[in-house]
Amino acid sequence: MKNLEPKEAYAYLQSHPEAVFIDCRSEIEYLFVGHPAGAIHIAWQDSPDWDVNPDFLGHMRIAASVNRPVVLICRSGRRSADAGRYLEKHGFPEVYNVAHGFEGDMDEARHRSTRNGWRHDGLPWEQT
């Protein structure tokens, strides 16, 4: 799995229309915090227990198949990295992780979207 900075991921998605962009955050994050424009939501973990979604692999096989590149994003890049390693173990050969995720790393005041991340970098996003 390769890590891409948010702007690199955006450029990759623009130049590879066959790639599938997956937001693997929880449903609440996806709906209320906002999400990258064009991303498909398939939660890796979700509330209330935050267990790995037992349907994740099945949903991914429907959305992407193992023949298409997959770009994963979460809040900070950690859950999407876990999901990416899981996909690689299950036969997905071309998986990319968006480093720093949608909201980015926390600053000294414990706020996100102030240092890095998809939203911080001014990339297209929307809120439902």
Where are these regions (language model features)?
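Rhodanese-like catalytic fold shared by cysteine-dependent sulfurtransferases
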Residues: 1-19, 27-69, 80-128
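Conserved G/P- and acidic residue-centered "switch" motifs that form tight phosphate/ATP-binding loops
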Residues: 23, 77
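Short, surface-exposed ligand- or partner-binding patches at beta-edge/loop junctions that are enriched
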Residues: 72-73
